[in-house]
Design a protein with these regions (language model features):
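Non-heme Fe(II)/2-oxoglutarate
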Residues: 2-101, 113, 120-123
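Ligand-binding loop in jelly-roll beta-barrel domains
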Residues: 199-209
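Histidine-centered metal-chelating micro-motifs
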Residues: 122, 193-197
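OB-fold and OB-like single-stranded nucleic-acid-recognition modules
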Residues: 85-88, 92, 96, 107, ...
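Preference for bulky hydrophobic residues occupying beta-strand positions
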Residues: 31, 137, 212-214
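Catalytic core of non-heme Fe(II) oxygenases with the double-stranded beta-helix
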Residues: 111-189, 206, 220
Length: 231
């Protein structure tokens, strides 16, 4: 685990104008998947990936949840590591003391799995246990879902086929949910204990995505051995 030493207090510099401070609650990170990652992950899924049914470890009411094959994931770990470190680094840079120079964070992907969702499928509100970070990436959307969304937009609360993140309670200047209408290439990273849910859609076809659980450890620069591995 990466040890973050939170600041005991903040010192404000001289601001030229108004500067908003955001000390409370988690952020949701967004990036765009490389085209080659989308292509390789789709090919991996279509050939059966690892062949390991991952659904007993999950809560989704969906068509299929299957573990990624390591060979498909391996060429793309640099992208996911960079995003994870950027995400944690952004938070640490604002709220934590600087890391000692001899400590270098190292990203570990604990598990990664594909989710194949058909019309009527859904994922109940849930969190990811025994991890620090989780993520969702989108690989395929059902053809014609834009028409369903256009019709849903006429309703008072469009949510069909959306993913919703949930944290905290409602307040005057705080909304406890974030609804996202996903598209192919979207990649979201967030703390593993952030609740989220996926709503069903009606369009015939498949929405394909993947999720991962991620840990970050402290790797010492001098010998590359994680601190927790030392005797």
């Amino acid at each position: 685990m990466l040890h973050l030493e939170h600041k005991s207090y903040y010192e404000m510099g001289t601001s030229k104008g108004f500067v908003p401070l955001r000390p409370f609650g988690p952020s949701i990170g967004h990036a765009t998947l490389p085209e080659q990652t989308i292509k390789d992950f789709n090919a991996d899924f279509e050939k059966g990936a690892s062949g390991v049914d991952w659904s007993p470890n999950l809560v989704g009411k969906v068509a299929q949840e299957i573990l990624m094959s390591p060979d498909a994931l391996r060429p793309h770990t640099r992208f996911f590591s960079d995003v994870a470190l950027h995400y944690v680094g952004d938070y640490a840079g604002r709220h934590c003391e600087p890391f000692p120079e001899d400590i270098k964070p190292k990203v570990h992907i604990q598990s990664g799995w594909y989710v194949s969702q058909k019309e009527g499928d859904f994922n109940p509100v849930h969190l990811h246990t025994n991890t620090e970070l989780s993520c969702i990436g989108y690989l395929q959307m059902p053809e014609g879902i834009e028409e369903e969304w256009a019709k849903d937009d006429e309703d008072h609360y469009p949510c069909k086929g959306h993913v919703e993140f949930v944290h905290g309670t409602h307040s005057f200047l705080g909304k406890p949910t974030m609804m996202v209408r996903p598209k192919v290439g979207d990649f979201f990273i967030f703390p593993g204990d952030v609740m989220h849910t996926v709503y069903p859609f009606e369009t015939k076809g498949e929405r394909r995505s993947f999720s991962m659980n991620i840990l970050i450890t402290e790797k010492e620069k001098d010998n590359g051995i994680p601190k927790e591995a030392k005797s």
